[in-house]
């Protein structure tokens, strides 16, 4: 089913195809349905299905999923005599891994914020970055238990910057939602760089961080640069919600992180 939206004569025409299937089943009968999706094309969905679900064997994929989750969850081992507390810990760890999510077909193709199809070559593209919520704890955790994924996440940020002119704030499947405040891709990038994680282009990362921090017409950044804080009683074209104190704190922290990255790279003139 093709649910792609089409832009025609300045109007967005969405097919928004939905389907419902009714089956006449008998009591105890089981149905096995294999599905696939793609953010790129119908053909991409077919390739994803062929690559990821070549057999109609539910138990096989259930076992593979369980093995994969155990592999990731076992990266932290705890000693605890209380089973309930152990269940709580690993349930919380599981929840921490539900996002960010891979956003690409099996061949690396994905739909970018510039409305074009791109291909991640040698890395995995990620999306669903709720950065205002996750930069404080989740992403630092990933640097210890999922460093390879952190490298791919930073590369995803930099690709987003190349395609959209700024780092993501709260990107979701090829688009920017602009939910919440700050530009918290920055501390995620800087944390990875200072810990020596990955092979991403650190110079490009610094460029992206500085460019994002200098979007004067975005959510009071120009006012913040002018005054050293975001005034509570002044708005700009993108500052209607104000939140002056929160923005000042978030911008100050992100800018501190940029300074640490510049220091690490020997860039004293940033």
Can you say where each PLM-predicted feature lies in the sequence?
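Acidic/polar, glycine-enriched structural segments that form the non-catalytic walls/loops
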Residues: 1-125, 159, 166-169, 198-214
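A conserved hydrophobic secondary-structure block that centers on an alpha-helix together
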Residues: 14, 79-82, 124-128, 135-140, ...
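Second-shell loop/turn segments in exported
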Residues: 51-58, 74-80, 127, 138-143, ...
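Extracytoplasmic/secreted proteins, especially bacterial periplasmic and envelope-associated proteins
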Residues: 64, 68, 84-91, 136, ...
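Secondary-structure capping and boundary motifs in well-ordered enzyme cores
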Residues: 84-85, 124-133, 177-185, 247-251
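Active-site acid/base region of carbohydrate-active enzymes
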Residues: 87-101, 105, 162, 175-180, ...
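Alpha-helical support elements that line or immediately flank enzyme active sites
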Residues: 91-104, 127-150, 190-196, 256-266
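Flexible glycine/proline-enriched surface loops and loop-helix/loop-strand junctions
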Residues: 121-123, 134, 138, 173, ...
């Amino acid at each position: 089913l093709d649910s792609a939206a089409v832009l025609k004569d300045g109007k967005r025409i969405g097919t928004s195809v939905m389907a419902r299937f009714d089956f006449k089943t008998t009591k105890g009968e089981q149905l096995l349905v294999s599905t696939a999706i793609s953010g790129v094309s119908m053909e991409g969905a077919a390739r994803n299905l062929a690559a990821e679900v070549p057999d109609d064997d539910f138990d096989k994929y259930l076992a593979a999923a369980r093995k994969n989750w155990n592999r990731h969850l076992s990266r932290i081992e705890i000693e605890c005599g209380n089973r309930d507390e152990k269940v709580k810990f690993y349930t919380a760890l599981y929840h921490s891994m539900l996002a960010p999510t891979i956003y690409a077909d099996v061949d690396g193709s994905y739909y970018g914020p510039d409305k074009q199809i791109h291909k991640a070559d040698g890395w995995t593209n990620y999306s669903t970055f709720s950065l205002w919520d996750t930069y404080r704890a989740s992403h630092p955790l990933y640097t210890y238990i999922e460093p390879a994924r952190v490298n791919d996440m930073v590369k995803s940020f930099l690709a987003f910057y190349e395609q959209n002119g700024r780092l993501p704030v709260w990107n979701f499947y090829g688009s920017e939602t602009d939910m919440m405040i700050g530009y918290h891709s920055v501390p995620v990038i800087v944390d990875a760089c200072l810990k020596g994680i990955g092979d991403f282009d650190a110079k490009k990362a610094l460029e992206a961080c500085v460019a994002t921090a200098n979007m004067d017409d975005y959510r009071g950044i120009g006012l913040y640069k002018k005054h050293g804080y975001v005034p509570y009683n002044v708005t700009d074209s993108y500052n209607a919600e104000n939140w002056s104190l929160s923005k000042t704190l978030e911008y100050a922290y992100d800018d501190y992180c940029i300074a640490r990255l510049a220091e690490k790279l020997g860039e004293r003139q940033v």
